[in-house]
Structure formats: C-alpha cells, structure tokens
Amino acid sequence: MIHVTCNQEAFELPEGASAMDLANKMKQSHCFVGALINDQEKDLSTTLQDGDTVLFLTWDDPKGREIFLHTSAHILAQAVLRLWPSAQPTIGPVIDQGFYYDFANLSISEEDFPAIEAMAKTIAEEKFPISRQVFPDKEAALAYFSQNPFKAELIAELPEEVEISAYTQGEFLDLCRGPHLPSTAPVKAFKLLRTSSAYWKGDPSRESLIRIYGVSFPTTKELKEHLHQLEEAKKRDHRVLGTKLDLFSQQTCSAGMPFFHPRGMVVWNALVDYWKRLHQRAGYQQIQTPQLMNRELWEISGHWENYKENMYTLTVDEEDYAIKPMNCPGCMLYYKTQLHSYREFPLRIAEIGHVHRHELSGALSGLMRVRTFHQDDAHVFLTPEQVEEETLNILNLVSELYGTFGLEYHLELSTRPEQGTIGSDDLWELATEALKRALVKSQKPFIISPGEGAFYGPKIDIHVKDAINRTWQCGTIQLDMFLPERFDLKYTNAQGEKSTPIMLHRALFGSIERFLGILIEHFKGRFPLWLSPEHVRIITVADRHEARAQELAKHFSQMGIIVSVDSSNESVSKKIRNAQNMQVNYMITIGDKELETHLLAVRTRDNRVLNDIAVEQFSHVILEELRSLSLTPSL
C-alpha cells in the first residue's frame, strides 16, 4: 500500500494506483482534468508514489483549463488529418484566448470550418482514451516522425537526456510533453475562429504555414457566452476606437511603435499625472535613467547573455551599446551613487522608463503588444524583515490605483521553480512566506502557482478584469535576490556591517501603452471626465453666437477644463452627433436664448439635456468631477 495526501487529507491506495484511482476513490473523477502531483502538472493516468501530494485540477483552474485546451488542439490536428491526410502538423500551443495549430502542406479557408468542426465533434463523441508513451531514445522518436520534418527538427534539438513523449487518441499520435485529458469526451463545445499565415518558428526565412485558431468548452452554454463576449470585444477593439477617437495611429515606418496624437496625449498625461501624485503620497522618489547604455552594463545584469535577441543593439565609437529593454539596471547604478544605511529603508525609487524590446512582427497588436513602451517601474530596497510590511504597502497601492479606474482584479503568487534558482532555501522560504502573509492581510483573492516564480525570487502577478470579464495581466511585484548581488549593492546594517539589500521590483500599470489599450476597451472609448481628451464642446447655432462661444471657451480653459468650439456650417444636430461620436462628455449649445440670458443649455453624451444652467454652477460641477476622479458623470 502507498499513502498520499490530497487537500490535506491522507489516503491509502494499492501499489501502482494512479491519480485517476484516487479521484475515483473520492467519487469526483468526472470533475477533474488533470492533477498537480508534488507541484508538477500530470495526467490523471500518472502512477502515484508513496508520500505524493496531489491537487486535482478542474476546468475552473487556469492550469486545468490549459490541459483542456491543449487536448482540444490535438483534436483539431486529428480532425484536419482525417480530412486532409497529406497535411503536416507542426505545433499547437495554448494561448490566452484558446489555442491554435500550425500546419504545412495545407490550404484551407474559413469555408472549411464547418467540416473541421463536425469532425472534431465526432472525435469527441468517439470518446477516445488518451494515453502517453515514452520513446526509448531520441533515435526511436526520430524514426517515428521521419516523415514530418518539423517534428523531427524539434526532436533533434532536444538534449540527449530529455524524456521524449507522445500522446495517442484513436489513430492520432502527436509529439507532446502533456499533460492531457483522460479522453476526448469532455470537449463538448468546439469552435474555430480564424486562420492566418505563420512562419515556422516565427522566422520569415523559414517555411510558410497556415495557422488555425480555435476555442473549446465543456458545455455549449459556455461556448455561446464566450462567442458573445468576442462579439462585444470587437465593438471595443482599442485599435478601431483609437483611430475613430483620434487617439493614436500605427505607421509602416515603425511597426510596433505607436504614434500618439494630441487627444491621445491628453489621456496619457492624465494617467501619468495621477501616477505621479499617487507615488509622491506613498513616499516614492522619481528618477530617470538613460535609454542607451553600453554592453558592460548589460553583461553585469545578465541581459547580454540571456536576452540579447530581444534587444536593439548598436555600435558607437567602436563600443557596443543597447537600448534598454528594462529599467532595472539603470536603477542599480543610481543606487550605487550614494552610501546607504538600513535607517533609510525601505528606499522607494520609481521611474516611468521608455523601453524597447524586439517582438516578432506577427506578435504585434495595437497597444497591447508593441516594441516600445513606457513601464512604470519602482524598485524598493529593504531588509528581509521589511518584506512583508512593504509588500502589503504595495498591495494597498495596487488596490487604490485599480479602484480609481473601477477595475476588479485578482492576485497570483508564483513560488520557487524546481531548478535554476539562486539564493538559499531559507531565504526563499522567508521571502515566499512574507509575500503570502502580505497577501492574506490584503484580504484580496489570490491563487498560488507552484514553481512559476522567477529564478531570482517569488512574485505576485496582478490580473485585471475588464467590463466584459476578460482578464489581463498588468502589474507585478517581484522579489529580486539577483540584481543586488550582480551589481554588488550594499548598505550598512544595524550591526554596522555591509549587507546586500533585498529588492522588491514592482510595476502597477505594467506598460502604460497596454494599460491605455485596456482602458479604451474597458470604457468602450467613453472615458470618465478626468481621463477624457475633450471635456466640453461648445456648439454654435449661428455665426452671431461665435463670440460668446469663444468667450466661454476661454473662461473654461483658464480653469483647466479641456474645451473646443464647433462653429462650423454643419447643422446643430450634426454637430451634436459629431461630438457624441467623439465621446465628448458635455456639449453646450449657444443660441439666441443663451446669448441673451447668459445661461447654458447642456447636453451629455448620453443625450440628457439640462437647460438654464448658470456658468458658475456648471464650472463648479465640472471641476469637482475632475478633482474627485469620478467614474460617473455629475450632470
């Protein structure tokens, strides 16, 4: 007999029992898609060992959902091969919104989707058991996939000692690490979304492939809800709204590097000004470090060795330089400009740094995935004893910032990876427990992702939920035990000795560009007044009303209200529609009556009309709405 633990409960099982046997014993096997066995993702068919700790995964768990979608990608490949036997499957990973599979020697269009979906449904209904097999060696794997040069190339690149596995469902076998569902049966709702071209390994010099995107769910109801969400997402697409509202544009001369227009810069500046006020109140000092620094710096930080392919490099005066992809190394150099004592800690240093990272052209997407962006970093230097309290301070800052935008969020604690980490076991345990205690004290929901931390320390990721319930990973809090050592940072401790500080690296917006894209979609372009690129538009009925309109515009502008005048020859109704299409918060119409009474006729973008409003009253209401950072209109 063996003894295992699941949900802090002990179970006794016969030798050779699998995770599925344990699930059956718990009478919940129908709910489970996979398992974490000693923090490692495994199939339910995995044989358990004495002393194992098991955590079952369901569709509702992020890792469980990945397993479900991964199996769905295999179903897609199997369906395509049944219909087009000469197609060559390459890779089929899980992505944020579903999965895709790339094929060579295949030419299809979306007109073929119904046939593929019908075949996928058949495969699911056939309830094929999914089994894992391990090749005895690399030669055996290469021999099996000798007719597929893409799979053979992947196998050839693997180290000799790596276990090479494949998964079988019915007649289909695919090279894969897994894990997978126990069978194809749970995939009851399957939908293909689109196709695109792709290059093998993202390299334009390599073979051209066709990529098929899809989603899947355990129930038809969930699929319908998801498709409805996708339709709503199309209406909110920040790339479309960004153009319509004249916020930003993309130019072919600089792919992945957006041009912000005057209206977009108003929103940008409102975000940055708010960020600066928030951080000044929280005790942060702001710095600015260069964008261009030499190779020596990036060798110390480790970027030159491990990240160079994502950096823009150049040679100046026969010396190698790189445009910074991250702000951290520059802050390390700033720290070293002065001597430091434990009495200064926590030392909070913030920077909105302009960074550049080379992304493949196929990965670029509006403001969400770019090659240049501004990261709102901060580095907090502290002693090990201060980690918990300072993490809680940062979490409170997170709550205030996202609350200002009406955004809900959840937190994810990623713990120590199995291999390749730095730092002692004791320091990792101290750091992880400190972050965990801070999360508990914050009273915000969080999940733990075992083994998903960085090599230099545990981290907390912040996942924001928008108006249509999509989640976006924005901010992060990372405990870094690596860079302070690499840069030989020191402080004088309470005993008068030199010590290396612990560093909390955190970003709240993450990327300002990406956060702005999220806000455009969250608000559907209808920004609250304090973020709006145009607070008020004054509309004239006739030419004789323009002088009064300009007088009012000057009055409002001097108060800090962003205002414009539309004295064009368009009809009043057309001017109002134009303003509403541009999501102007308030419109003021000036006609003969308003000219005579000096009162205002105000219309909101939701078409609420308020007549005979005094200028002073309107000004007071608007200024208070701006000051309070209100998310709802005051009129």
UniProtKB/Swiss-Prot annotation:
Residues 237-528 are annotated as: Catalytic. Gene3D superfamilies: 3.10.20.30, 3.30.54.20, Anticodon-binding domain, Bira Bifunctional Protein, Domain 2, Threonyl-trna Synthetase, Chain A, domain 2. Residues 1-58 form the TGS domain. Its main location: cytoplasm. GO terms for molecular function: ATP binding; metal ion binding; threonine-tRNA ligase activity; tRNA binding. Its EC number is 6.1.1.3. It comes from the Bacteria. It catalyses: tRNA(Thr) + L-threonine + ATP = L-threonyl-tRNA(Thr) + AMP + diphosphate + H(+). It is found in: Cytoplasm. Zn(2+) binds at C328, H379, H505. GO terms for cellular component: cytoplasm. Disulfide bonds: none annotated. GO terms for biological process: threonyl-tRNA aminoacylation. Coiled coil: none annotated. Binds 1 zinc ion per subunit. It holds the Pfam family TGS. The keyword Flavoprotein does not apply. Its cofactor is Zn(2+). Keywords: Aminoacyl-tRNA synthetase, ATP-binding, Cytoplasm, Ligase, Metal-binding, Nucleotide-binding, Protein biosynthesis, RNA-binding, tRNA-binding, Zinc. Homodimer. HAMAP family: Thr_tRNA_synth (MF_00184). Catalyzes the attachment of threonine to tRNA(Thr) in a two-step reaction: L-threonine is first activated by ATP to form Thr-AMP and then transferred to the acceptor end of tRNA(Thr). Also edits incorrectly charged L-seryl-tRNA(Thr). Belongs to the class-II aminoacyl-tRNA synthetase family. This is Threonine--tRNA ligase. It comes from Chlamydia trachomatis serovar L2 (strain ATCC VR-902B / DSM 19102 / 434/Bu). The lineage of its organism: Bacteria, Pseudomonadati, Chlamydiota, Chlamydiia, Chlamydiales.
